[in-house]
């Protein structure tokens, strides 16, 4: 699973996902890509599940680039704990994704194979996405 090697602070505020993604919204490496259409937190497990599904589908043919990285720690309190006594401990990591962000890219395969692999990865995501091709 993806997570930062070290961070400046252990815990972060939740924040909010306003507007659209101005960074990471163009295809840079491959020819085909999966683009987010909704804002969401995508966990490192979901990113890994999508990557594995694509890799399994493409086999040795193409190359896959993961364009998002989970750098936000999400804290959780133990079940049946009384209120107060501070913030919970970090449980897992998420990537903050805004609409327009490229999640995965793929190259070195035909459009048919890429579409099939990316649609399987899209089913692992908690948001609506679209398949795009670079011109």
UniProtKB/Swiss-Prot annotation:
Localization, UniProt: Plastid, Chloroplast
GO CC annotation: chloroplast; mitochondrial large ribosomal subunit
Keyword Chloroplast appears in the UniProt entry: yes
CDD domains documented for this protein: Ribosomal_L16_L10e (cd01433)
Pfam families: Ribosomal_L16 (PF00252)
Record keyword Coiled coil present: no
Coiled-coil portions: none
Biological-process GO terms, alphabetical: mitochondrial translation
Gene3D superfamilies, sorted: Ribosomal protein L10e/L16 (3.90.1170.10)
Keywords: Chloroplast, Plastid, Ribonucleoprotein, Ribosomal protein
Gene Ontology MF annotations: rRNA binding; structural constituent of ribosome
Major subcellular location class: plastid
Family: Belongs to the universal ribosomal protein uL16 family.
Subunit comment: Part of the 50S ribosomal subunit.
Protein name: Large ribosomal subunit protein uL16c
Natural source organism: Coffea arabica (Arabian coffee)
Phylogenetic classification of the source organism: Eukaryota, Viridiplantae, Streptophyta, Embryophyta, Tracheophyta
